[in-house]
Amino acid sequence: MQLILLSSLLLLGLSLANGHETDPEGQILNSLVETVSRLEKKIDKVENAFLTVHRARSFGSGSERLYVTNKQVGNFEAVRNTCVQAGGRIPSPQLLNENKAFASVLERHNKAAYLVVQNSAKFTNWAAGEPNNADGNKLCVKADAQGAWHSASCDEDLLVVCEFSFI
């Protein structure tokens, strides 16, 4: 919407610069400027409301990331696709407080979920004896209901949990 208004202002300016007085008293231009100003104020309000909600949601965990489930289950590929379509990704906790926030979702539903472990991760939460891919079939990682990490088959149907990072 703002782009359309700015384009209109540009076209009007070009028209006036070329000597075509389509708005001799500047009413259209003034109206467009007022509309853009109102839209900017509304955008500021939406941004502030969004940040307030985000801060409230992350207040308890101290995490800047939000972990959400749709209560469905799926294998790794299905979970990844679901998260990407929702604008998120499979969780990848980088800090203890992020893992706690992620684990709180799992604990609430008493289920495990996939996560992605970064090769350069400074934080890990492997359960005792993990990672363990002795049979060669555990190429994914899951977190149990308490947030401990385990090697897992990518074909397991686990709780869909997606990570969203807004800041």
Swiss-Prot record:
Domain of life: Eukaryota
Domain C-type lectin: 62-163
Location in or out of the cell: Secreted
GO CC field: extracellular space
A GO BP entry: ossification
Annotated signal peptide: 1-19
Chief subcellular location: secreted
GO molecular function: carbohydrate binding; growth factor activity
Record-annotated disulphide pairs: C83-C162, C140-C154
Record's keyword terms, sorted: Disulfide bond, Lectin, Secreted, Signal
PANTHER family: C-TYPE LECTIN DOMAIN FAMILY 11 MEMBER A (PTHR22799:SF1), TETRANECTIN-RELATED (PTHR22799)
Family (UniProt): Belongs to the alpha-type phospholipase A2 inhibitor family.
Subunit structure and binding partners: Homotrimer.
Function: Has no PLA2 inhibitory activity.
Miscellaneous note of the record: Concentration of this protein in the serum is 8-fold lower than in the E.quadrivirgata (another non-venomous snake) serum. This difference may reflect the difference in the food habits of these snakes. E.quadrivirgata preys upon snakes including the venomous snakes, whereas E.climacophora only preys upon small mammals and birds.
Designated name of the protein: Phospholipase A2 inhibitor alpha-like protein
